[in-house]
């Protein structure tokens, strides 16, 4: 049975559980605090690791000083095919869901301007880069026939399943300038313009024990639909220590987001069920990247990037919801940490590339009240992988250079495992996070928690021209 009494939890977890939809927290980190890292097939094959190498428009995704490394103009376009598979398991059952999207993942170009001067400045280059990735993600968790909700004395239903369903995209358009000083120091700056579209659903399904019919419930304030724009700026530098070793550093300001949000609400004392609009302002974390590269010869190069978030996500406070979100991130968010390693080996006109990246879990351990797998009682449990977790990426690619024209292909496998909380919803004088159907309400003081394995398989094909 879904219990009607509050259970003891840690202060931070209880505060978080009372106020906010899990999907809002996930999207704050997964969409608004991240950068689309879909570059050229070469960039993607090296796991996005090029902070001390540079040389093309994808440098604007990591270190704009990389524009200054280019000595010839270039334009390229990249087709991306992204596959996303979620396997959600709970109480001995599991559900798989896969989806594939085909998009124009990246377009980039660099114009080089040699400086015929007697100073050490050799080039000033300008670049533009467009990066786009799908945010589509469907996580359907199994039901549990032991989780029974009594709507009244003559009507009871068991949980038949739950789904977080997100549709959308995240894009980043960057304009930058890079300069080359004596082929040993490179500096650059960029302006970045973001756009995001998110349609988010949070739905539970219950089967009637009387007639077997299925009733669907939407969480309060869902579905919601966000159309957002943001901007940031980037500064970077690359220096050659000697012909074989380079170091780089870049800093990206927070992304300042404007979020236009429409959402469904239910059971309002005056308006009943309807849709409302609100505007939000959000600031993502400030990020810094340091890089080192080893260039053994014209045929082999290896690069390592380390990115660290220096601040935490923060909403402009327009009401209680933003205050509670900010308090949650202040207490529980761990600063972003990402390592990227990539290498390239050239055999005449043929290129072989590979890479690896690791992104750390964004949250400290959280304690919540959850139903046991039998669905018969609630227990307090601490999770170090709740909502989101570590992410591992492996990549490789091939390329062929036809002198002025080139073709590159790459593959990425991205994996993550996390605990997925759902179903909790309370209804009292100050808080309404319950689930609603046209005729019934579901409240629960505890979460159901499924184990999710996410695997993404991405393919990229780039056609480019150097001039």
Predicted regions and their residues:
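Bacterial Sec-dependent N-terminal signal peptides
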Residues: 1-24, 463, 467
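Transmembrane beta-strand segments of Gram-negative outer membrane beta-barrel proteins
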Residues: 25-50, 68-85
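Outer-membrane beta-barrel translocator/receptor signature
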Residues: 53-62, 68-140, 168-171
């Amino acid at each position: 049975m879904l219990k009607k009494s509050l259970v003891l939890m840690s202060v931070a977890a209880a505060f978080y559980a009372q106020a906010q939809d899990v999907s809002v927290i996930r999207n704050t980190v997964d969409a608004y605090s991240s950068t689309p890292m879909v570059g050229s097939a070469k960039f993607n094959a090296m796991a996005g690791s090029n902070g001390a190498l540079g040389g093309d428009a994808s440098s604007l995704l990591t270190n704009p000083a990389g524009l200054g490394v280019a000595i010839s103009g270039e334009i390229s376009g990249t087709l991306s095919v992204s596959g996303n598979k979620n396997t959600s398991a709970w109480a001995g059952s599991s559900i798989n869901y896969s989806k594939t999207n085909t998009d124009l993942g990246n377009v980039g170009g660099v114009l080089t301007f040699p400086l015929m001067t007697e100073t050490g400045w050799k080039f000033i280059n300008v670049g533009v880069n467009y990066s786009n990735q799908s945010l589509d993600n469907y996580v359907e968790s199994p039901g549990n026939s032991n989780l029974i909700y009594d709507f009244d004395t003559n009507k009871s239903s068991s949980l038949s399943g739950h789904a977080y369903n997100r549709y959308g995209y995240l894009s980043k358009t960057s304009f930058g300038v890079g300069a080359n000083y004596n082929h040993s120091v490179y500096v650059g700056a960029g302006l970045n313009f973001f756009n995001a579209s998110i349609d988010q659903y949070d739905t539970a399904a219950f089967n009637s024990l009387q007639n077997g019919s299925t009733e669907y419930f939407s969480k309060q304030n869902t579905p919601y639909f966000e159309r957002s724009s943001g901007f940031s700026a980037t500064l970077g530098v690359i220096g050659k220590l000697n012909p074989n070793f380079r170091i780089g550093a870049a800093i990206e300001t927070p992304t300042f987001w404007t979020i236009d949000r429409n959402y469904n609400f239910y059971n309002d004392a005056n308006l009943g069920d309807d849709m409302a609009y609100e505007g939000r302002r959000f600031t993502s974390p400030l990020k810094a990247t340091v890089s080192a590269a080893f260039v053994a010869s014209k045929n082999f190069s290896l690069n390592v990037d380390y990115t660290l978030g220096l601040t935490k996500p923060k909403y402009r406070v327009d009401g209680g919801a933003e205050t509670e979100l900010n308090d949650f991130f202040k207490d529980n968010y761990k600063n972003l940490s990402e390592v990227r390693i990539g290498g390239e080996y050239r055999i005449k006109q043929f290129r072989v590339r590979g890479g690896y990246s690791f992104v750390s879990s964004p949250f400290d351990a959280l304690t919540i009240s959850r139903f046991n797998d039998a669905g018969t009682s609630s227990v307090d449990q601490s999770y170090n992988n709740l909502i989101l977790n570590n992410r591992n990426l492996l990549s490789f690619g091939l390329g062929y250079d036809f002198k002025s024209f080139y073709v590159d292909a790459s593959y990425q496998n991205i994996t993550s495992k996390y605990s997925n909380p759902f179903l909790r919803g309370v209804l009292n004088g100050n808080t309404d996070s319950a689930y609603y159907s046209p005729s019934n309400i579901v409240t629960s003081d505890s979460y159901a928690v499924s184990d999710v394995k996410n695997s993404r398989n991405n393919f990229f094909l780039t056609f480019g021209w150097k001039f």
